[in-house]
Design a protein with these regions (language model features):
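S-adenosyl-L-methionine
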Residues: 2-50
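Residue-level signal for inorganic ion chemistry
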Residues: 6, 70, 123
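Short, electropositive alpha-helical surface patch
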Residues: 29, 53-56, 121-134
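A short glycine-rich, Lys/Arg-flanked "PGG" loop and its adjoining helix->strand segment in the class I
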Residues: 49-66
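Short, glycine-/aromatic-enriched active-site segment of Class I SAM-dependent methyltransferases
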Residues: 71-88
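Short alpha-helix
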Residues: 92-106
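Conserved S-adenosyl-L-methionine
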Residues: 107-119
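Flexible, glycine-/basic-rich loop-and-beta segments that form/coincide
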Residues: 125-158
Length: 158
C-alpha cells in the first residue's frame, strides 16, 4: 500500500512492474500479463508470511525471490524491545527459522540465507532469504546455517 519508495532507476526500467498503493496480501497471478521471473519483498508493519503465498502463486516456474525479513515485524509484540528494536539473538534465530520454514511449506526452495549488511533505521538487524520456485521444495540443509548467520550478524552489526 506504500508509494514513492522505489529507486528512480528501477521505477523507469521497463522490466520492473511497479505496484504502488496495492495490498500485496491479495496478490493473484492475474495481476500480471505474464508470470514474473523475479520478486523482491521489503515490507513493514506486516509479516512477510502474509504475502509469500501470493508471490509463490504468481511467479513462473524457475523464478527467484529475495525477501527482507525484519524481526521487529515477525517476532510478535512480546519479543520486540524498546523503540521497536529486536536485539536478542535467540529471537533473531527463531524468526529467521520460522520464516524460512514457512517459505518451504509454501513450496519455495531456500537457496541462501544471509544477514543484511544494512541495519534498519532504528538499528534493527535484518535478514535476507533467496528463494526459488522450482516445483520441488528443498534447501532444508540451509536451515542449519541460521545460528552461524545470526552470530555473524551480531558480530558485525550489534
Amino acid at each position: 500500500v506504500g508509494y514513492g519508495q522505489l529507486d528512480w532507476k528501477l521505477r523507469n526500467d521497463p522490466r520492473v512492474v511497479v505496484m504502488e498503493r496495492t495490498n500485496a496480501r491479495n496478490m493473484e497471478p492475474d495481476w500480471f500479463t505474464e508470470a514474473p521471473d523475479f520478486a523482491s519483498m521489503d515490507v513493514s508493519f506486516i509479516s512477510v508470511k502474509l504475502i509469500l503465498p501470493g508471490i509463490y502463486k504468481s511467479l513462473r516456474e524457475g523464478a527467484q525471490a529475495v525477501i527482507l525479513v525484519k524481526p521487529q515485524f515477525e517476532a510478535g509484540r512480546g519479543r520486540v524491545g524498546k523503540n521497536g528494536v529486536v536485539r536478542d539473538k535467540d529471537t533473531h534465530r527463531q524468526v529467521v527459522e520460522d520464516t524460512a520454514r514457512f517459505a518451504l511449506d509454501t513450496g519455495f526452495s531456500i537457496r541462501q540465507i544471509d544477514y543484511s549488511p544494512i541495519t534498519g533505521p532504528k538499528g534493527n538487524i535484518e535478514f535476507l532469504l533467496l528463494l526459488g520456485k522450482s516445483g520441488t521444495a528443498g534447501g532444508t540443509e540451509v536451515l542449519a546455517d541460521i545460528p552461524h548467520i545470526v552470530d555473524m550478524a551480531h558480530g558485525e552489526l550489534a
